[in-house]
């Protein structure tokens, strides 16, 4: 199992393939992605790599983290993330991970944070149909209706779908195909949409449920 990398979402575009079909693409940028540290089975109980991306001002780094970056002999990074790996896939500390770490035609899993929607009603948050438009319904047309049962159990069960905060959740989209890799501009072009707003950070890993192919 290889390590993943951290990338930054740039935006979306579209291209036409040889058959004239329009393909939607999400562009992600891999800039200054380096190995910051190791986690070993003997010391930490599991094997992992700590990956960092995008240089950060030294004045905005805490003293403990300054020492971490000093030990790795690299400049401070804006975003850090651990990736579990198998024992034979360790990479040297301070090694750089470029866009050619992945290849066109390969399938990947993307983990990102969805865009926050604030406090949302049940119709927007859970796709409820709402109540009747007439026939005695007043004011509560977009309400979710009853949330409980009777005296027994006498409570609302945990996990009941109701209005509440929507978005800002970490989600993983599996089996997205890499359309192309642009090494000069440090871009990975991925087919389909990816969660998160522009300039947000995400992780790109080899797909675990699909065999990758190259075209």
Curated annotation (Swiss-Prot):
**GO biological processes:** translation
Enumerate the GO terms in the molecular function aspect: rRNA binding; structural constituent of ribosome
| One GO cellular component term noted in the UniProt record for this chain | ribosome
Superkingdom of the source? Bacteria
Region Disordered, annotated ranges: 136-155
This protein's record includes keyword Repressor = no
* Entry annotated with the keyword Transcription regulation: no
The known PTMs are summarized as: Methylated by PrmB.
Keyword annotations of the record = Methylation, Ribonucleoprotein, Ribosomal protein, RNA-binding, rRNA-binding
Protein name per its UniProtKB record: Large ribosomal subunit protein uL3
What residues bear N5-methylglutamine in this entry? 151
A family per Pfam = Ribosomal_L3
Which protein family is named in the record? Belongs to the universal ribosomal protein uL3 family.
What InterPro entries does the record tag this protein with? Answer: Ribosomal_uL3, Ribosomal_uL3_bac/org-type, Ribosomal_uL3_CS, Transl_B-barrel_sf
Q: How does it assemble?
A: Part of the 50S ribosomal subunit. Forms a cluster with proteins L14 and L19.
Q: Which SUPFAM superfamilies match?
A: Translation proteins
Report the function annotation for this chain. Answer: One of the primary rRNA binding proteins, it binds directly near the 3'-end of the 23S rRNA, where it nucleates assembly of the 50S subunit.
């Amino acid at each position: 199992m290889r390590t993943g990398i951290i990338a930054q979402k740039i935006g979306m575009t579209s291209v036409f393939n040889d058959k004239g079909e329009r393909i939607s693409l999400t562009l992600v940028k891999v800039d200054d992605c380096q190995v910051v540290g190791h986690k070993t089975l003997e010391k930490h109980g599991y094997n992992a790599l700590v990956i960092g991306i995008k240089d950060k001002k030294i004045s905005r780094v805490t003293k403990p983290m300054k020492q971490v970056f000093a030990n790795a002999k690299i400049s401070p990074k804006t975003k850090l993330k651990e990736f579990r790996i198998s024992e034979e896939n360790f990479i040297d500390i301070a090694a750089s991970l470029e866009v050619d770490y992945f290849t066109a035609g390969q399938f990947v899993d993307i983990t990102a944070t969805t865009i926050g929607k604030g406090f949302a009603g049940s119709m927007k948050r859970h796709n409820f149909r709402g109540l009747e438009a007439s026939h005695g319904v007043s004011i509560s047309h977009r309400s979710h209706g009853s949330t409980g049962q009777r005296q027994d159990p006498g409570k609302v069960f945990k996990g009941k779908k109701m209005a509440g905060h929507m978005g800002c959740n970490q989600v993983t989209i599996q089996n997205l195909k890499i359309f192309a890799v642009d090494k000069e501009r440090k871009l990975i072009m991925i087919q389909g949409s990816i969660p998160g707003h522009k300039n947000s950070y995400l992780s790109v890993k080899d797909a675990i449920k699909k065999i990758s192919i190259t075209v």
